[in-house]
Amino acid sequence: MAKNKIAIIGAGHTGSTLAFIIAERALADVVLLEIPKNEKPARGKALDIKESGPILGFNGNVLGTSDYQDIAGADIVVITAGAARKPGMSRDDLIQINENVMAQVTEGIKKYAPESKIIVLTNPVDAMTYAVYKLSGFPKERVLGQSGILDTARYRTFVSEALNVAQTDVTGLVLGGHGDTMVPLLSTTMVGGVPLRELLAQDKIDAIVERTRKGGAEIVGLLGNGSAYYAPAAAIYEMAAAILNDERRLVPAITYLDGEYGFKDICLGVPTILGANGVEKVVEIELSDDEQQLRDSADAVEDVKSALKNK
């Protein structure tokens, strides 16, 4: 039986951390692809990961390269490549720069890994997922964006800190766009099976929700240079594992909507079942009154999407 293969486009902090997790957990062989001028660092990171194998007890194959031919046969392609917003750069400038990156990357994927599933991480991730979906021509179930698992993990972490309980005992879902309008579902938030509202006052819950929405910015502020990469890489790993192992996990993911939740022609974070085909199903759940903010979140994503050339 052939071993699974995951190609990661972009060998920065998130891409290389993801490569390490995949190799260490023996999920798949990894191709870490960079632009030609950054090929040597990609090769160095790949070699460094391989050299940790004898110590940690894994035998993964990790290749650093700048040649798209090396992604041939990949089961999953993860896109982490793209520019970060710099001082003086408008939102529309960033969107157009990264849309151009998505166009270049998607051409390589279409040529060398046409049967792959694509997971997008590049920001603004909802809009970039939409761009990749349109540019690739792939079926909608094979183009996903990562945000909900990460946002939910942050939410669960902050709840666990407030209650001084195990993070793994907190369950919940965060839907919508990846930003200030994301929607933590309070009706689904449980701590060891107990509803969160029975354990925390509303003002404390509101503070947790706000901190979750600013979770990425909090990390950026603490780091001083760069952004989060451990948790984002872990979130992508969870998605990739669910697909390659056909786990049929119910997790939040960005996917193209065609009527679900009343939305059309938009990529948005919603509950999905992930399995061998990618998004096996979008799960539509009843939202309480305070969760109707999903409409506001979709409007914010539409506003960002309006700056795309391919729409």
From Swiss-Prot:
Top class in the EC scheme: oxidoreductase
Sequence positions that bind substrate: 85, 91, 123, 154
GO biological process terms held by the UniProt record: lactate metabolic process; tricarboxylic acid cycle
Oxidoreductase listed as a keyword: yes
Reaction equation(s) it catalyzes: (S)-malate + NAD(+) = oxaloacetate + NADH + H(+)
CDD domains, per database record: LDH-like_MDH
UniProt-recorded Gene Ontology molecular function terms: L-lactate dehydrogenase activity; L-malate dehydrogenase (NAD+) activity
EC number: 1.1.1.37
Keywords: NAD, Oxidoreductase, Tricarboxylic acid cycle
Superkingdom assignment: Bacteria
A Pfam entry, by short name: Ldh_1_C
Annotated catalytic residues: 178
Record: residues binding NAD(+): 10-15, 98, 121-123
Family indicated by similarity: Belongs to the LDH/MDH superfamily. MDH type 3 family.
Function: Catalyzes the reversible oxidation of malate to oxaloacetate.
Listed name of the protein: Malate dehydrogenase
Gene for this chain: mdh
